[in-house]
């Protein structure tokens, strides 16, 4: 037996550690490897570089509203392939794939509840659902959110994260821009606050309608906000755009948005602003996250 074989015979093979998938993730900005559970506790904000990663609609609403107060609205509304649209793939197949991937029926989730004990209606986009694109169901759910806010005489908050209108629904998608804007006019007539929170990215028909119609337009840090994307603009005007173009820090310098708020500070900031606008006592930052339990809304059959 050679000396190499003798060494080999004395080596005990080590057992390969098995790490479940999804335990670790990597920051999109700095590349830091992060523990998934810790990142979720930090509201999907990188603890090293403060990069705000994309957050699911449900996690966002649960992080905003008081525990035990959330009631979902418009969940019975489902998209339909009325036009029998097909590009490289059938629209109904794209819908089925997005629904399976996200667990959502469409790209907007609406809930009513309380924020530091104050009644609020909140909506949030699920960007993972076809890029948060706006179709008939998104428009109908947003209008439902406005109607609920009017009924409860309370504020409305919407977190936008969208690539714009859903091309598979053609003009029916574009119609939602006017539909949602008209609904918000009723909020203005009643004197009820509507706060729009712009997250990364907020583009196209969503930015050209209700996303920029807030009484206050708040953005998260480094969020991409605009109509056409930077690459499309550069190709059209044939000029190099300035650094940070269409990012929230660039837009606040130009007066296009009102403020930038970090995600961990968003809940208290929104509660403070809404309390002031509704002429209510300022929220206690140390108060536990327990709100008034709101009774479930009665089941209603609605058509988009």
Curated annotation (Swiss-Prot):
Its EC number is 2.1.3.15. Binds 1 zinc ion per subunit. It is found in: Cytoplasm. Keywords: ATP-binding, Cytoplasm, Fatty acid biosynthesis, Fatty acid metabolism, Lipid biosynthesis, Lipid metabolism, Metal-binding, Nucleotide-binding, Transferase, Zinc, Zinc-finger. Zn(2+) binds at residues 27, 30, 46, 49. It catalyses: N(6)-carboxybiotinyl-L-lysyl-[protein] + acetyl-CoA = N(6)-biotinyl-L-lysyl-[protein] + malonyl-CoA. Component of the acetyl coenzyme A carboxylase (ACC) complex. Biotin carboxylase (BC) catalyzes the carboxylation of biotin on its carrier protein (BCCP) and then the CO(2) group is transferred by the transcarboxylase to acetyl-CoA to form malonyl-CoA. NCBIfam families: accD (TIGR00515). This is Acetyl-coenzyme A carboxylase carboxyl transferase subunit beta. The lineage of its organism: Bacteria, Pseudomonadati, Pseudomonadota, Gammaproteobacteria, Enterobacterales.
């Amino acid at each position: 037996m050679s000396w190499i074989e003798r060494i080999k015979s004395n080596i005990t093979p080590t057992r390969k550690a098995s790490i479940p998938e999804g335990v670790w993730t990597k920051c999109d900005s700095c590349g830091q490897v992060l523990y998934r559970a810790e990142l979720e506790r930090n509201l999907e904000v990188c603890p090293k570089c403060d990069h705000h990663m994309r957050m699911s609609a449900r996690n966002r609403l649960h992080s905003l509203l008081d525990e035990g107060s959330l009631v979902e609205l418009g969940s019975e509304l489902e998209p339909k392939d009325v036009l029998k649209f097909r590009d490289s793939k059938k629209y109904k197949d794209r819908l089925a794939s997005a629904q399976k991937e996200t667990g959502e029926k469409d790209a907007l989730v609406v809930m009513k509840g309380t924020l530091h004990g104050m009644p609020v209606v909140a909506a949030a986009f699920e960007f993972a659902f076809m890029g948060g694109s706006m179709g008939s169901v998104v428009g109908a759910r947003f209008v439902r959110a406005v109607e609920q806010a009017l009924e409860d005489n309370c504020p409305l908050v919407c977190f936008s994260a969208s690539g714009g209108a859903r091309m598979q629904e053609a003009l029916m998608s574009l119609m939602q821009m006017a539909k949602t804007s008209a609904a918000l006019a009723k909020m203005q007539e009643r004197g009820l606050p509507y706060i729009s929170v712009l997250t990364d990215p907020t583009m196209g028909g969503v930015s050209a309608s209700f996303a920029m119609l807030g009484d206050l337009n708040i953005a998260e840090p480094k969020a991409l906000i605009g109509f056409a994307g930077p690459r499309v603009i550069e190709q059209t005007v044939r000029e190099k755009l300035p650094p940070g173009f269409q990012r929230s820090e660039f837009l606040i310098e130009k007066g296009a948005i009102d403020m930038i708020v970090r995600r961990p500070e968003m809940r208290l900031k929104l509660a403070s602003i809404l309390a002031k606008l509704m002429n209510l006592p300022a929220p206690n930052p140390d108060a536990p996250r327990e709100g008034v339990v709101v009774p479930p809304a009665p089941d209603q059959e609605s058509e988009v």
